[in-house]
Amino acid sequence: MRFVRIAAAASGATVFMWAGFAGAASAASAVRLVPHRAIYDLTLDRADEKSGISGLTGRMVYEFNGSACEGYTTNFRFVTRVDMDEQPQRVTDQQTTTFEDADGKDFRFVNKTFVDKELVKEVRGDAKLEDGKTVVKLSKPKENTLDLKGTQFPTRHMEELIGKAEAGQKFYQTTLFDASEDADRVVATTVVVGKQQAVPDDETKVMGKFSKDQVWPVTIAYFDDKEQQDGMPIYRINFKLYRNGITRDLTMDYGDFSMRGKLVKLDIYDTGKNKTGCSK
């Protein structure tokens, strides 16, 4: 899956993120991501006093579909109920739909954020990799065109990760455009991959035919010079990764608080009908 960060601050603001460009295509070519729908229960892991957060629960639903022939579609929903000190409970609902073409050159996105059922933000547009640049054309919240540095999109980012993990690479750095926040920046990522292993726990019961498969423990840190000038990541996520792209046992760390995501339901989609005539 791709990765999301969403922080509900006291002001009600939300921050959204979807978790070596030249080498990405070759590393990703042998990776096969399985279409699926995964549901995660969210709970508060820890909260520093300065965060103002006294409680957090929620649910994350992630749907991934498509193939290396037709491209990849994702539908994502991330709902959190956050209790703040001396403030009423706030419900934030992040809804995202994206399409990434099979070549990893085009990326379309629609991000909507609701706070207490009220639409407070919508970002809509598309991005293309052209002449070593990432050209972003926004239609909402207002029309705008941005020329950013060349990078990769979320599905290719995940394929690269799995390819490097299978090759035994434990540490690398790369970049990503994921249409986070205002869809106006490329973020840097630092990836650490642990030793592949079997980790039986409550979540493996949900994995069905993949329950005995081994996983890689992975940590990804995201950096953005526009927000952090001290070299510290703006967000960090830990998770267990299967070679087919499914993830579980998530810990999402925002600095002054973190939350856990436990996989509670997994549906694997039958794509046999969609692969007729597809040799990839």
From Swiss-Prot:
Outcome of swapping C69S: Abolishes disulfide bond formation
Signal peptide: 1-24
Annotated localization: Periplasm
Top-level division of the source organism's lineage: Bacteria
UniProt keyword Disulfide bond present: yes
InterPro entries tied to this protein: EipB-like
Disulfide bonds listed in the record: C69-C278
A Pfam family: EipB_like
Cellular component per GO, a single term: periplasmic space
Consequence when changing C278S: Abolishes disulfide bond formation
GO terms classed as biological process: cell envelope organization
Annotated knockout phenotype: Sensitive to the cell envelope stressors ampicillin, deoxycholate, and ethylenediaminetetraacetic acid (EDTA). Decreases virulence in a mouse model of infection.
Keywords for this protein: Disulfide bond, Periplasm, Signal
Summary of subunit composition and partner proteins: Monomer.
Function: Functions in the periplasm to maintain cell envelope integrity.
Protein name: Cell envelope integrity protein EipB
Gene behind this protein: eipB
